[in-house]
Amino acid sequence: EYTIVRYVDPLTGATQDENPLMAIDLVQEYFAKIRSQLVSEEKLETQNIIANPGIQAYYMKNRGDAALKVDLTPHNPLLVTKTGTIAGFPENEFILRQTGKAVNVKMSEVPVENELEEVEHEGKNLNRGLRDYNVVSNVVCRLTNESDGHSASLFGLGYGGYIITNRHLFKNNNGTLKVQSQHGDFIVKNTTQLKMVPVGKTDILIIRMPKDFPVLPQKLRFRAPANEDKVCLIASNFQERYVSSLVSETSSVYPVGNGEFWQHWISTKDGHCGLPLTSTKDGFIVGIHSLSTITNSKNFFASIPANFEEQYLAKLDQQDWTANWKYNPNEVSWNGLRLQENKPGRIFQAVKEVSALFSDAVYEQGQEVGWLFRELKDNLKAVAVLPNQLVTKHVVKGPCQCFIQYLNESPEASAFFKPLMGQYGKSILSKEAFVKDIMKYSKPIVLGEVDFIKFEEGYNNVLRMFHDIGFEKCEYVTDSMEVYKNLNLKAAVGAMYTGKKQQYFEGMSEDEIHQLVIASCFRLWSGKFGVWNGSLKAELRPLEKVQACKTRTFTAAPLDTLLGAKVCVDDFNAQFYDKHLTAPWTVGICKYYKGWDTFMNKLPEGWLYCDADGSQFDSSLTPFLINSVLRLRLEFMEDWDIGARMLSNLYTEIIYTPIATPDGTVVKKFRGNNSGQPSTVVDNTLMVVLAMNYALAKLSIPYEEMDSRIRYFANGDDLLVAVEPTKGGEILDSLQASFSELGLIYDFNDRTFDKTQLSFMSHQALWDGDMFIPKIKQERVVSILEWDRSTQPEHRIEAVCAAMIEAWGYPELLQEIRKFYAFMVTQEPYSAIHAQGKTRYISERALVTLYKDEKVVLSDIGPYIQKLAEMSLGCVDEVVMHQADSMDAGGSSRPPAPLVRQQDQDVNVGTFSVARVKALSDKMMLPKVRGKTVLNLQHLVQYNPEQTEISNTRATRTQFNNWYDRVRDSYGVTDDQMAVILNGLMVWCIENGTSPNLNGNWTMMDGDEQIEYPLQPVLENAQPTFRQIMAHFSNAAEAYIEKRNSEQRYMPRYGSQRNLNDYSLARYAFDFYEMTSRTANRAREAHIQMKAAALRNTKTKLFGLDGKVGTEEEDTERHVASDVNRNMHSLLGVNM
């Protein structure tokens, strides 16, 4: 009711205008300071204040002519009231409260404003402004020391590769130290290895962490406390599922004793030791909480010495301890708020928004208790929320029905295939499977296990090896179109987007793509993280993994990160592929054309071989190993400071990735590689190579002796090792422990002297008498036949052909697949494709050429040519003879080119000339005028118009253009708005048809809102008919129905009314569908039947009622009085 209140001090005349809801104690404090100041200046007597301690309040309204006067005096809880009881409320003693009744006064009686300037300025300095304390809270660590049966837990401050904490953490020092921080959870297994420095005589200790501890930002500033300081206590709340920041109220400080400890008045609890006290004046840390009295009535902090930065922190940097960490530590300690601030710019057209983890909307939707959120712990923390869902649609549709039919009809084939079936199944796409796999990233990181001197030796050996194989300086790929061409356009755009990249880039110009690449690079350079999408991989998995609910997760990079990432890594990766087998990796190898044989021959004969496959490889990679890959890449990249910063920020994002999960939670991981980053295989391979060189350095095997004692090849997490037979076993025995020190889980017990027993990249080497050929297991080949993942019949045919290629080397299996293929092409819908000559025949000679890289000569393909000749003789009447010369009777005469036998071709085709038959013969009967042909045959041969463009069932382009322009003008919209309206019109017509008898309005939806548009401009401007106009939309409508069916069962109303039961024909169930020669027979029959059913018993009147023809006629009837009435005569009593 009242908008402002003016407080007036009757003793000083001072006033203060405030909101009526202002806390009265602040007002009371304001006037008390004014009175104190005047007393000290001897302008006011203390007795006057005692006699008249109260003030007055005038409540006023906007534009009102009256005010309400209220007297305010200090509350006396012992005052006896009119009712005979005391006032009470002793906790409010001396606080101003209303005394007596309020009195209405005129506005003219309200004292004029009189705020004292000097006091106002003083009031401005009472409280300081906003300050960002995230710089401090982001480096707060929680430390737990478990030694000698005792456990102590407190906090510390991360600073580079060091932690600043309390000395009393290590009353016992013979156990493990667990470190929880905003860049992960770590475990130091042996605290006696830690080097520590006490700071003066205070309770402050600096711990030097092991070298594999990722360095933290070094932005903190320290100084000694001062008497005038006000401080606040800052903490990080390490919950099991997330981390949040905490800030206390401010407190004054006071030195105790000789100043090594200071007292503060902030409430604390056990375990709060080590938390920093930060000055609100400048943000400097002045001490860390250390002591409390037994009754917790007083708290003390260890003060920072005056020379702390110069004497301690500056000397720490002199040790060059953090020199080898190349990732950007300033971008590590991000949180959900940072994700919201770093959302992709408008140029990327993101459609989803990241929201805070515990916003009001989150509480309403219950997202904070999502099925994954409940399971989070350790090194997986929830940071934000992003709308998402679990995709359970599988790319593997199910068992191949054609293969099942073949086995049912062929007992011999069934007896052969059944033992090889059932070994693979569809991966499980469930919540449990996702939780099981994603939680592999939650394991704490073990520190201090690595021998850093030996690791540097191994790293330098890898550098030397790169130089020896001729690895050259790499460039940053700044050609935007080159980046675009190397994208997988069938993949999704990202977690904050919808659809595939192909649709995203559709219609974009080169300049627009270039701007996208620049924007992505700028995001990387700025340290802005994109939100990656975590999903389950839909694939065929071995049966034991399916039964154990083990499904691999895929973490895909968003477009806003991916483009810039490819700028940084693509050139290095391309050169890395080219060096396969020259260097100890097979990334980029082609297993065909003797590729696998070359690979196997790289392993010395008679050595001891071992194949090792990493377990939980991606999730076990530590920041230390990934940082080593970054060091190696920067070593071979061109000198460009912008590119180096982009690359460093990229690998920071790869380690500390924000992942959007299916339950809507965005989690932050602190270890491991991402399977969907553009360099996963190369980076994983490099880390295995680094691990191998570290292990060899620990064995003290010099670089020069490596080739004579060990050979190895890596591909991602796959590793193949060959060691000389005398002492090689000792090398293999030591590898597992060395790999484990780096966090990698490998088993090196699968050993053999037979190369054909080795398994590498799921392939084995099969010796066929001449060479090694790569083979996958027969059960895996059969799974291609057993399971159908094709969306089109042509793709299924290609899959069976791929199975034939993979089966070469298993003669019986290949022959059985050929039998199935022969059966398959006789069944619908494959028979129609076969009839068009679109099914492939893969000959034995082609397979030999593919695997063995042998040249094909005429004698090899002679039997095939002979068989084809016999087949053609049985089908045609004409005999075609090979001649010395061939002549084109309808073309210009020219001497035949000499036939020269060409050498070194994959297939020699230059030995015989084949007669050509003209497409149109001039012997046919053609229309003529005065003896001259009226057709241009040369034009006719090339004239192949699109059927729909010349069909009279579709409006011409001119008619469609006129219709479009008139409808757009009638609706008064732009071309961009019209594009959306036509989407709605097409979908409405799919449901309601295009009958000329339509009237009224048509509707489309905008979210939950229904919008109506008049039909009149749509119909009256349609020439020749509305159905012929809508025929232009036929293909789009067909694709739209398919899209709807891919999401859920959908049958247009036109098909439902005809009781169409086959949902595979739903795409043809609309009345403006355009039939062409490409329409399948079954679909054509179904559409015509639906059309016939819709038109049954329909009558169309050629003429309506003619309103111009009159119906008047002259009445010539004559009546007499004896007639019955005016319309009836009477004849002897008979009515006529």
Swiss-Prot record:
Reactions catalysed, as given in the entry: Hydrolyzes glutaminyl bonds, and activity is further restricted by preferences for the amino acids in P6 - P1' that vary with the species of potyvirus, e.g. Glu-Xaa-Xaa-Tyr-Xaa-Gln-|-(Ser or Gly) for the enzyme from tobacco etch virus. The natural substrate is the viral polyprotein, but other proteins and oligopeptides containing the appropriate consensus sequence are also cleaved; RNA(n) + a ribonucleoside 5'-triphosphate = RNA(n+1) + diphosphate
Residue numbers annotated as active site: H168, D203, C273
SUPFAM superfamilies, per database record: DNA/RNA polymerases, Trypsin-like serine proteases
Assigned EC number: 3.4.22.44, 2.7.7.48
Domain called RdRp catalytic: residue spans: 607-731
GO biological process: DNA-templated transcription; proteolysis; viral RNA genome replication
Pfam families named in the record: Peptidase_C4, Poty_coat, RdRP_1
Stretches that traverse the bilayer: none
Keyword annotations from UniProtKB, A to Z: Capsid protein, Host nucleus, Hydrolase, Nucleotide-binding, Nucleotidyltransferase, Protease, RNA-directed RNA polymerase, Thiol protease, Transferase, Viral RNA replication, Virion
Gene Ontology annotations for the cellular component aspect, listed alphabetically: host cell nucleus; viral capsid
Domain Peptidase C4 intervals: 123-341
Similarity section: Belongs to the potyviridae genome polyprotein family.
Species of the source: Ornithogalum mosaic virus
Cross-referenced InterPro entries: DNA/RNA_pol_sf, Peptidase_S1_PA, Peptidase_S1_PA_chymotrypsin, Poty_coat, Potyv_NIa-pro_dom, Rev_trsase/Diguanyl_cyclase, RNA-dir_pol_C, RNA-dir_pol_PSvirus
Site (Cleavage) residue list: E122, G123, Q365, G366, Q883, A884
Protein name: Genome polyprotein
MF term (GO), any: nucleotide binding
